[in-house]
Amino acid sequence: SGSCTTQTCWLQLPEFREVGNYLKEKYHRALKVDLLRGAGNSAASRGAIAETFSSISRKELVHLEDSPDYCLENRTLGLPGTEGRECLKKGKNLSKWEKRSCKRLCGECGLAVEERKAEMVSSCNCKF
């Protein structure tokens, strides 16, 4: 009698956090490529573009324009900036990520955290 074995191959993605960290690293090391605007579609300009990209590894992330400064308000792009934004620092059931939101929103943009306390008066519809 004979025996059979079955082999199956598949690709599996790594953990989502690992993919995110990899992409974040690529983003921070991305190469800016300057292409001449209005250079046309001539053979010479196509050759220059091909030469520019041939010197860049296929594994590198490239961009044509700088990313906006997310710390600053930019109404055109709909970015609120970080100045004056509320952050969660204390409270029950907050994750580590949420507790560090003040540091991310303010600290990484060179701003200080301003703590404000407010007294709220409201009707509780109490019956005695």
UniProtKB/Swiss-Prot annotation:
GO terms for molecular function: cytokine activity; frizzled binding. A lipid is attached at residue 1 (O-palmitoleoyl serine). Keywords: Developmental protein, Disulfide bond, Extracellular matrix, Glycoprotein, Lipoprotein, Secreted, Wnt signaling pathway. Disulfide bonds join 71-109, 87-102. Gene3D superfamilies: 3.30.2460.20. It comes from the Eukaryota. InterPro entries: Wnt, Wnt8, Wnt_C. Its main location: secreted. Glycans are attached at residues 74, 93. Palmitoleoylation is required for efficient binding to frizzled receptors. Depalmitoleoylation leads to Wnt signaling pathway inhibition. Proteolytic processing by tiki1 and tiki2 promotes oxidation and formation of large disulfide-bond oligomers, leading to inactivation of wnt8. GO terms for biological process: animal organ development; canonical Wnt signaling pathway; cell fate commitment; neuron differentiation. It is found in: Secreted, Extracellular space, Extracellular matrix. GO terms for cellular component: extracellular space. It holds the Pfam family wnt. Ligand for members of the frizzled family of seven transmembrane receptors. Probable developmental protein. May be a signaling molecule which affects the development of discrete regions of tissues. Is likely to signal over only few cell diameters. Belongs to the Wnt family. This is Protein Wnt-8. It comes from Thunnus thynnus.
